[in-house]
Amino acid sequence: MWGSRIAVALRILVVLAILPVFLLLVYSLPFVRPVSTLMVKDYALLQGVNRQWVDIENIAPVLVNSVMMAEDGQFCSHGGVDWHQLGLVLDDAGDGGPSRGASTITMQMVKNLFLWNGRSYLRKGLEFPLALIADAVLSRKRIMEIYLNIAEWGPGIYGIEAAARHYFKRSAAKLTARQAALLAVTLPNPALRNPAKPTRNMQRIARIVAGRAMRSGPYVTCVK
């Protein structure tokens, strides 16, 4: 009996391991429009979901640049995991210093596609191999496109097109540099940050991000 249960459990584990790889291959097709686990949950609970897919060509470049500079400035140069940044995080943790994030845009994308929210060493451990696989399967441009279309920008607001229309009454293609920067700095905490009504601290960070986005040319070539 125990032998058969173990065999079934192993089969389930194999399927769970293979499924994300298969889905990433499917998501490499440009006409496929993935959804996040949060969106699936909202659909299952019959909660409202505001998401309008938009191709990356129809997103203002300043928004793409702002998100990259705010979330993952080395997006075009690492392989899905920023090992240098991760090393700095581990050093800080060992020294008892303040915590900092090491999640890349690729890691955030796979988390949104396949995993759950909340702090968890297990989830973080799963992000690493999934991000490496995603980087091998998908182009950087496709990774950015998927991320911008599944990221949460507020309760029930998914994707940059829905966010741009909800907060600024315009399409993602027509966002200004200031609006793009405010949307970018909203991403780490969309439940508490409102880009249409930014706090002074949000405005300060947005100005920094906007400045970096203006000088981001050498860092954003992979999404052009």
Curated annotation (Swiss-Prot):
Any one GO CC term of this protein is: plasma membrane
Classification via InterPro entries: Glyco_trans_51, Lysozyme-like_dom_sf, PBP_transglycosylase, Pep_trsgly
Q: Where in the cell is it found?
A: Cell inner membrane
| Domain of life of the organism encoding this protein | Bacteria
Which terms does the UniProt entry file under GO BP?
Answer: cell wall organization; peptidoglycan biosynthetic process; regulation of cell shape
Give the way it sits in the membrane: Single-pass membrane protein
> Mind telling me which Pfam families this protein's record contains?
Transgly
- The membrane-spanning stretches of this chain are 12-32
What is this enzyme's EC?
Answer: 2.4.99.28
Catalysed reaction equations from the record: [GlcNAc-(1->4)-Mur2Ac(oyl-L-Ala-gamma-D-Glu-L-Lys-D-Ala-D-Ala)](n)-di-trans,octa-cis-undecaprenyl diphosphate + beta-D-GlcNAc-(1->4)-Mur2Ac(oyl-L-Ala-gamma-D-Glu-L-Lys-D-Ala-D-Ala)-di-trans,octa-cis-undecaprenyl diphosphate = [GlcNAc-(1->4)-Mur2Ac(oyl-L-Ala-gamma-D-Glu-L-Lys-D-Ala-D-Ala)](n+1)-di-trans,octa-cis-undecaprenyl diphosphate + di-trans,octa-cis-undecaprenyl diphosphate + H(+)
Report the main location listed first in the record. membrane
Q: Name one GO molecular function term.
A: peptidoglycan glycosyltransferase activity
The pathway entry for this protein reads as: Cell wall biogenesis; peptidoglycan biosynthesis
* Annotated keywords: Cell inner membrane, Cell membrane, Cell shape, Cell wall biogenesis/degradation, Glycosyltransferase, Membrane, Peptidoglycan synthesis, Transferase, Transmembrane, Transmembrane helix
NCBIfam families to which the protein is assigned, alphabetical: mono_pep_trsgly (TIGR02070)
Q: What does this protein do?
A: Peptidoglycan polymerase that catalyzes glycan chain elongation from lipid-linked precursors.
Q: Could you say which protein family the record assigns here?
A: Belongs to the glycosyltransferase 51 family.
State the protein's name: Biosynthetic peptidoglycan transglycosylase
**Biological source species:** Brucella melitensis biotype 1 (strain ATCC 23456 / CCUG 17765 / NCTC 10094 / 16M)
Q: What is the lineage of its organism?
A: Bacteria, Pseudomonadati, Pseudomonadota, Alphaproteobacteria, Hyphomicrobiales
Gene name? mtgA
